């Protein structure tokens, strides 16, 4: 039953309600309620400019106060260049220190090796002296001693050990031990070699024992 304006007498009566319109209204209402609940549950949905905590606002102000309003692009570039120069200088210093460390370590390592080699050669000196005497008497021309002498000389050469002290060499008090000076002039040479000297590189293992004489006239 309807009124003169076309509206039903009782709009809420199920008989006067459009089922499709009612379903649409309920769905829209349910969506609005769900959106409202989600906004209430979300921490971001409740935030506003007036709800910022005093602690957060104070922290923001502190950060803003650290910004230099007079800093321009040129100032930033200059600061970066200064810092880059300082870091480059630090890198160069560290590189130089490392290079010096490596050189020092290498010298120490080589010194240890040379000391060990010198110790081995020192123990072989009596054998070397016997072989020199055998050579002077002609016993090293052939036979087992010749083979032994050649092998020992090769070993010493591999260790960079060399002998010195030959007749006619200029006398050097740093490496020659003079038993007697038979020279009559100012120029002194080795007249007789009583015992050869040996050195390892620049290190003298043993000085040569010699008699000083005059150089032979040519």
Curated annotation (Swiss-Prot):
Its main location: cytoplasm. GO terms for cellular component: cytoplasm. InterPro entries: GrpE, GrpE_coiled_coil, GrpE_head. Disulfide bonds: none annotated. It comes from the Bacteria. GO terms for molecular function: adenyl-nucleotide exchange factor activity; protein homodimerization activity; protein-folding chaperone binding; unfolded protein binding. Signal peptide: none annotated. Keywords: Chaperone, Cytoplasm, Stress response. It is found in: Cytoplasm. Residues 48-75 have a biased composition (Acidic residues). Pfam families: GrpE (PF01025). Residues 23-40 have a biased composition (Basic and acidic residues). GO terms for biological process: protein folding. Residues 1-75 are annotated as: Disordered. Participates actively in the response to hyperosmotic and heat shock by preventing the aggregation of stress-denatured proteins, in association with DnaK and GrpE. It is the nucleotide exchange factor for DnaK and may function as a thermosensor. Unfolded proteins bind initially to DnaJ; upon interaction with the DnaJ-bound protein, DnaK hydrolyzes its bound ATP, resulting in the formation of a stable complex. GrpE releases ADP from DnaK; ATP binding to DnaK triggers the release of the substrate protein, thus completing the reaction cycle. Homodimer. Belongs to the GrpE family. This is Protein GrpE. It comes from Corynebacterium glutamicum (strain ATCC 13032 / DSM 20300 / JCM 1318 / BCRC 11384 / CCUG 27702 / LMG 3730 / NBRC 12168 / NCIMB 10025 / NRRL B-2784 / 534).
